[in-house]
């Protein structure tokens, strides 16, 4: 006979329910929604009861509409979405655009970022011999490298050993070993930090190293950790001697600047070893917990001069938030001697930012698509394409390039999954091959171009990564590491299902939903 529940079980359930209801995430969402309802109510009330205000609203909308059309730097998809909003809400949309039409971060942060970039970008010095070697191997790829040098202050490096990781499970032991061996400094930047085995091990090492006198710094995104960390977690880290801050704090105020998130994943040890990729610091990324089947990710370890570039990217972000702090760049950005290269791989780490209007990651992706001669293989968890990317991918397939895109078989966000699948019919018709990773969720952001170059980083194929977030990636030119990436992609394909037109039929309601989602996607 089953025993009845004890009273403490009910108290625990009540405590759990109240903890969820009054959690920071729920309170923030509820307050923001309440403000949104109030704001739209005020707009409609004013338009209904005041002819003068209606006329002013129409005038503002007309001016904002003209300003939007005039903006050459704004993607057509953003313009179309706003134009539809102007038609649906002619009185209110002008004020909405005035408040939230600029997708860049707030002006104070932009100015601090610009000053920090101006201070640290000159310290990102590369190896002229590496650029010359790349030009000798592949002049066209060297032009892409020049673009990154000129518009992202991202030089090319030789003398850097590169290791590719097909899953976070394999990457973690090396990360822990390098952290344990740190002698001077440790920098950690992550979109998500979650309490558990992975972060617990890393945090303990950071605490020990900080106590030993090393310079240990941590940056995490507040929205990414909103439901995962206590609201005062920065104070807890500082109590351990770890310098830390959470980026773009989530406050219950209706503000689309919250869209600008720090999506980077960077770990730098002593300025000479760096890790990056799609792996956040939470247990699902090393398959210690199961959320959406097997979690497939990727990452790279850089040892040598290229790692210094990621230390510079981290410190640029840090400098923007602590402009008055004295930073000893000779100590924090030490010169790194070349190490034995892995198969002669040339390395080019770069960062992308919404502060300027240069969509660096998107332009690099377009370069890769247009340069592909024989094959182009892409891993992405989300496939929300603007017209430029959709056209270039289709054209590459039509001119005979073997274009293969690997997507999740088990989605983490069903609405985004539905939106991603809405692009499949067009791509399939053009000859693009699309695969669904049946074991679970594919979170890797890996590109392989003709076995000539690859990219491993944080950049998804969606509007948020390409236009709104702070991102980073590593371009790899040649060498044995490309063979490792190719083997990983072959492994993904062996357990994936190739999709056909019949897999993409949504019916009338599904197609209408996808159309609506496409209209809303650029605004979110």
Residues of each region from the PLM?
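Short glycine/threonine-rich loop-to-helix capping motif typified by GTGT followed
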Residues: 391, 417-421
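Catalytic-core elements of nucleic-acid end-processing and repair enzymes
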Residues: 445
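Helical hairpin unit composed of two closely spaced alpha helices linked by a short loop
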Residues: 382-403, 408, 413
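Active-site donor-binding acidic/aromatic loop of nucleotide-activated sugar
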Residues: 434-438
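CN hydrolase (nitrilase-like) catalytic-core segments centered on the catalytic cysteine
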Residues: 419, 428-431
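Structured, soluble regulatory/oligomerization domains located on the cytosolic or IMS-facing side
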Residues: 186, 373-376, 402
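N-terminal localization/anchoring segments of enzymes in phospholipid and broader phosphate metabolism
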Residues: 1-363, 367, 371, 411, ...
